[in-house]
């Protein structure tokens, strides 16, 4: 991902897990109108932040492949993220079946759980750009 869709500021990968962060600046396009007078990061954007972190975790598999969302299971939204918050993401690969990778992820603000879910990605070959 690249701007304006890059939603990871910092990342630390250690084998089976990734820790990543994103600081909500307040001027992001997805905050406009969500909600007037009380901007809150939309749940789908929290999921995107976690998904991007998951892809950083499996980056070794992405040299020749692109990860496409296959699904999000058990997504739960517990606490809002607002401008000024730093969202911390932790993700772990739970299983791999052929070209499908399963990852469990959580996002937190100040140790309060914002969102959790089980993500699956299907790896497809990168197109040959010759």
Language-model-derived ranges and their functions:
Residues 104-106:
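Beta-strand signatures of extracellular beta-sandwich domains
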Residues 11, 41-64:
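Active-site helix/loop of acyl-thioester processing domains in fatty-acid/polyketide metabolism
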Residues 53-90, 114-122:
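Hydrophobic beta-strand-centered segment that forms part of the acyl-chain substrate-binding groove
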Residues 1-36, 40, 65-66, 78-82, ...:
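Non-catalytic linker/capping segments at the edges of enzyme domains
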């Amino acid at each position: 991902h690249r701007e304006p869709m890059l939603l990871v500021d910092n990342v630390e990968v250690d084998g089976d897990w990734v820790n990543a962060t994103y600081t909500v600046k307040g001027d992001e396009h997805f905050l406009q109108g969500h909600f007037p007078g009380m901007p809150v990061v939309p749940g789908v954007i929290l999921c995107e932040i976690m998904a991007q972190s998951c892809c950083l975790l499996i980056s070794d598999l992405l040299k020749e492949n692109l990860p496409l969302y296959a699904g999000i299971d058990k997504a739960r939204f517990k606490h809002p993220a607002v401008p000024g918050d730093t969202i911390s993401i932790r993700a772990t690969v739970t299983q791999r079946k052929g070209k499908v990778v399963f990852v469990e992820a959580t996002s937190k603000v100040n140790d309060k759980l914002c969102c959790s879910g089980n993500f699956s990605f299907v790896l497809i070959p990168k197109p040959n750009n010759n």
